[in-house]
């Protein structure tokens, strides 16, 4: 198959607010700014891949028209976290006059929660000093990591994870344009691995389409290095039945044969346990505690193989109590 060499998340990125998927409440409020040509500082908060950057770019396009790329700048705060990025790049852009008919410019600061406290304090002063010539749109995963003086100067927009329906509809639209077919099971797989993240969903589709123009659930789980939900269910069941040896073989098959990372398996086990309607409440609490301990130990540098086997042992012990 001749798959487009262009990265699909850019190829199919919405060009205007009307094309934004799954964030209707946010879009309606942003449209009011376009209508009045007035814009406060904004704070976009939410998980990755839910449309924060897309909305910022689409807003600038509609606000400025043909001159949008001259009056809009995007910076990623995770690249340079210190105060120098505020004093140099941000301040330099904010202090210059807008071009064309625009009355202000927009600076979009992605991952603003990566800025240090000192950098955020400097940013707050810059936002105040250059409010006439520049509006700031800050994007973050966690608004709690943004200092209160900045939050109080922004209109805050909370982006929700996209629904399975919204992701499936967009995936179907892209698949039709690219001339690929998708099994029903593949839609379920894409929504499972993406967790409301459209960027992850589209990347999974493109990765699978490179392998075959007929996308299956098997392709999706393989290309994203995820275990099938049933494999996680079976692994947990063997542990709770006390069959440590079988569970260990299943775990090693997922980690070594399929190359699934231990932290990804922890995430999938957490999803299975937290969503279960059959597990006893006390047992569920114990299992999540075991997952948290394994996650912490691995984050501190403990051997992942040993910790994953130890996790199975703890789950087996909890199931026997």
Curated annotation (Swiss-Prot):
Organism per entry: Methanocorpusculum labreanum (strain ATCC 43576 / DSM 4855 / Z)
One Pfam family of this chain: Rep_fac_C
An example molecular function term from Gene Ontology annotations: ATP binding
Disulfide bonds listed in the record: none
The protein's name in its UniProt record: Replication factor C small subunit
GO cellular component: a single term: DNA replication factor C complex
Domain of life from the UniProt record: Archaea
InterPro entries per record: AAA+_ATPase, ATPase_AAA_core, DNA_pol3_clamp-load_cplx_C, DNA_Rep/Repair_Clamp_Loader, P-loop_NTPase, Rep_factor-C_ssu_arc, Rep_factorC_C, RFC_lid
Keyword line: ATP-binding, DNA replication, Nucleotide-binding
Role according to the record: Part of the RFC clamp loader complex which loads the PCNA sliding clamp onto DNA.
Family according to the record: Belongs to the activator 1 small subunits family. RfcS subfamily.
Quaternary context: Heteromultimer composed of small subunits (RfcS) and large subunits (RfcL).
One GO-annotated biological process of the protein: DNA repair
Gene designation: rfcS
Binding residue positions for ATP: 46-53
């Amino acid at each position: 198959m001749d798959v487009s060499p262009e990265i699909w998340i850019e190829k199919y990125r919405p060009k205007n607010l009307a094309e934004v998927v799954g964030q209707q409440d946010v879009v309606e409020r942003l449209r009011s700014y376009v209508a009045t040509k007035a814009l406060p500082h904004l704070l976009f908060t939410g998980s990755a891949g839910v449309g924060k950057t897309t909305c910022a770019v689409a807003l600038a396009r509609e606000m400025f028209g043909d001159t949008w790329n001259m009056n809009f700048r995007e910076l990623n705060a995770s690249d340079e976290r210190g105060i120098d990025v505020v004093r140099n790049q941000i301040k330099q852009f904010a202090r210059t006059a807008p071009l064309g008919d625009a009355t202000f410019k927009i600076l979009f600061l992605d991952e603003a929660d990566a800025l240090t406290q000192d950098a955020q304090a400097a940013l707050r002063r810059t936002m105040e000093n250059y409010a006439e010539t520049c509006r700031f749109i800050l994007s973050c995963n966690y608004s709690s990591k943004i200092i209160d003086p900045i939050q109080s100067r922004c209109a805050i927009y909370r982006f929700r994870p996209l629904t399975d329906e919204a992701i499936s509809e967009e995936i179907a639209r892209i698949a039709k344009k690219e001339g690929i077919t998708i099994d029903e099971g593949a839609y379920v797989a894409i929504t499972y691995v993406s967790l409301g993240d459209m960027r992850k969903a589209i990347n999974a589709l493109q990765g699978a389409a490179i392998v075959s123009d007929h996308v299956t659930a098997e392709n999706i789980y393989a290309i994203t290095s995820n275990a099938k939900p049933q494999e996680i269910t079976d692994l947990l069941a063997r542990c709770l039945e006390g069959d440590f040896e079988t569970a260990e073989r299943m775990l090693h098959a997922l980690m070594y044969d399929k190359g699934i990372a231990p932290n990804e398996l922890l995430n999938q086990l957490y999803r299975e346990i937290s969503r279960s309607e059959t597990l006893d409440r006390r047992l569920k609490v114990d299992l999540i505690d075991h997952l948290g301990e394994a996650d912490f130990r691995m984050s501190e540098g403990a051997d992942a193989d040993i910790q994953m086997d130890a996790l199975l042992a703890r789950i087996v012990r909890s199931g026997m109590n």
